[in-house]
């Protein structure tokens, strides 16, 4: 038997550390619960006091509804901008058990919007960070964590343990997976999404009779149209509002406020700019020809678990045609051009907002989208004394749009064009750490 590799040992150490942390959390939970003796079959005095202000709201449903919350088990997929506020309010409201699944770790760039995490938790799994916060917020809630990605292999085993699922992800492939698994298991989904200053939420497969995600979107969006928070940016409170609303819908479902008779499929849309606006649209009912919840379903648990349904293939990948390596230079190579004061032109194709955050000296800002991408000529943006034989270097944030721009310049007849590999992000790593990453 061969000796385990360094990578295998490190993975095993990480797993043992996670198991140790979970045991400590469980032991701490036991000691916390011992402090609260029940005064009846339902709650301790602390719980009556903790939840009293929501139990006296007529629409909530008094003690009966609070008991339903305590007996419920909710899975939250994603502990980011949507999942963070949803987790805070669901745990505060008294959900009995909350599962959190997220493979990512906390990064400093998350903290302006993912409010369940803090600076001390940077580098920690998001689900562990969220668990730590919830344990301090409400010791009556049991928290189960899954520091892994939801996939074809584990989805049914995890989702089957819960009554309801919150989809707080930002990946179309995972969104379709959650939908299909929940429909096949008869679970209701509270689904949210958000980007920049806009967000949406809806309730899917309500009581296993309402429309599902595939009823609304039989086909996924074009991969080229999908923008991440990293690329498009995000206003924290705008997305947080959607996460809070998801918690409200979850409470209404669990407490029985919604019934098959009064529930109407809807899509709620929130926009923060230019004026705050919240609109609710009535959506169509379950579709008879839906691939998973229709009269003749084409998707089964077996097909998902054996990989017949490949969600990444179904959703596709963004098409990207990289430029030939001979037209690319490293940040250090470009730095040599600058240090030697060699005549050249530097074009920065990032959006104006990003250019204003930081840029290299003497850079000319020509946004790739929509300006550069649609342009038939580029001369109007270049210095008056420039010629087509000048050396032109193109930079962006990560080195993707700059390749597209460089290729277009070559097609326009500029022979001496070079793309700066890795963009400003790589420049910060290799040349000047004072250039901020954002």
Swiss-Prot record:
What cofactors does this protein use? Zn(2+)
UniProt-listed SUPFAM superfamilies: Activating enzymes of the ubiquitin-like proteins
List the GO molecular function terms: adenylyltransferase activity; ATP binding; metal ion binding; nucleotidyltransferase activity; thiosulfate-cyanide sulfurtransferase activity; URM1 activating enzyme activity
EC class of this enzyme?
Answer: transferase
- Where is this gene product found? Cytoplasm, Cytosol
Provide the E.C. number(s) assigned to this enzyme: 2.7.7.-, 2.8.1.-
Q: Which residues form the active site?
A: 229, 396
Q: What does UniProt give as GO cellular component?
A: cytoplasm; cytosol
| Record key words, sorted | ATP-binding, Cytoplasm, Metal-binding, Multifunctional enzyme, Nucleotide-binding, Nucleotidyltransferase, Transferase, tRNA processing, Ubl conjugation pathway, Zinc
Q: Which residues form the Rhodanese domain?
A: 340-436
- Chain sites annotated for binding ATP: 81, 102, 109-113, 126, 170-171
Q: Which cysteine pairs are joined by S-S bonds?
A: none
Residues at which Zn(2+) binds: 212, 215, 290, 293
Q: Which InterPro entries match?
A: MOCS3/Uba4, Rhodanese-like_dom, Rhodanese-like_dom_sf, ThiF/MoeB/HesA, ThiF_NAD_FAD-bd, Ubiquitin-activating_enz
Q: A Pfam family in this protein? A: ThiF
User: Which pathway does the UniProt entry assign to this protein?
Assistant: tRNA modification; 5-methoxycarbonylmethyl-2-thiouridine-tRNA biosynthesis
* HAMAP family xrefs: MOCS3_Uba4
What role is this protein assigned?
Plays a central role in 2-thiolation of mcm(5)S(2)U at tRNA wobble positions of cytosolic tRNA(Lys), tRNA(Glu) and tRNA(Gln). Acts by mediating the C-terminal thiocarboxylation of sulfur carrier URM1. Its N-terminus first activates URM1 as acyl-adenylate (-COAMP), then the persulfide sulfur on the catalytic cysteine is transferred to URM1 to form thiocarboxylation (-COSH) of its C-terminus. The reaction probably involves hydrogen sulfide that is generated from the persulfide intermediate and that acts as a nucleophile towards URM1. Subsequently, a transient disulfide bond is formed.
Q: What family name appears in the similarity comment? A: In the N-terminal section; belongs to the HesA/MoeB/ThiF family. UBA4 subfamily.
* Annotated protein name in UniProt: Adenylyltransferase and sulfurtransferase UBA4
């Amino acid at each position: 038997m061969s000796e385990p590799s360094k990578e295998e040992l490190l993975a095993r150490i990480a797993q043992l550390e996670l198991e140790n942390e979970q045991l400590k959390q469980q032991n701490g939970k036991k000691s916390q619960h011992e402090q609260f003796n029940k005064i009846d079959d339902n709650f301790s005095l602390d719980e009556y006091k903790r939840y009293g202000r929501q139990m006296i709201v007529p629409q909530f449903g008094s003690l009966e509804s609070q008991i339903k919350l305590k007996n419920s088990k909710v899975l939250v997929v994603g502990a980011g901008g949507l999942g963070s506020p949803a987790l805070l309010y669901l745990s505060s409201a008294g959900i009995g058990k909350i599962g959190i699944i997220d493979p990512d770790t906390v990064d400093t760039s998350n903290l302006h919007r993912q409010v369940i995490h803090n600076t001390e938790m940077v580098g920690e799994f998001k689900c562990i960070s969220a668990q730590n916060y919830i344990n301090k917020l409400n010791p009556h809630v049991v928290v189960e964590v899954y520091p892994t990605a939801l996939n074809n292999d584990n989805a049914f085993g995890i989702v089957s343990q819960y009554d309801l699922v919150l989809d707080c992800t930002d990946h179309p492939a995972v969104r379709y997976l959650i939908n299909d698994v929940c429909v096949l298991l008869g679970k209701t989904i509270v689904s949210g999404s958000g980007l920049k200053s806009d967000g949406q939420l809806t309730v899917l497969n309500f009581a296993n009779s309402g429309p599902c995600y595939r009823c609304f979107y039989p086909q996924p969006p074009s991969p080229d149209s999908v923008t991440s928070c990293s690329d498009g940016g995000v206003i924290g409170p705008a997305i947080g509002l959607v996460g809070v609303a998801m918690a409200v819908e979850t409470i209404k479902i669990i407490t029985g406020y919604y019934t098959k008779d009064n529930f109407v499929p809807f899509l709620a849309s929130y926009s923060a700019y230019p004026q705050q606006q919240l609109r609710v649209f009535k959506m169509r009912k379950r579709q008879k020809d839906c691939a998973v919840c229709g009269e003749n379903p084409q998707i089964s648990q077996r097909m998902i678990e054996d990989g017949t349904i490949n969600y990444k293939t179904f959703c596709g990948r963004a098409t990207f045609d990289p430029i030939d390596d001979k037209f690319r230079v490293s940040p250090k190579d470009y730095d040599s051009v600058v240090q030697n004061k060699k005549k050249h032109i530097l074009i920065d194709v990032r959006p104006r907002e990003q250019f204003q955050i930081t840029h290299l000296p003497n850079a000319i800002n020509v946004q790739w989208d929509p300006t550069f991408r649609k342009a038939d000529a580029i001369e109007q943006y270049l210095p008056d004394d420039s010629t087509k034989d000048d050396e032109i270097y193109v930079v962006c944030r990560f080195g993707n749009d700059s390749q597209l721009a460089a290729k277009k310049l070559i097609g326009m007849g500029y022979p001496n064009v070079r793309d700066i590999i890795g963009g400003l992000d790589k420049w910060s790593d290799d040349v000047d750490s004072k250039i901020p990453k954002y």
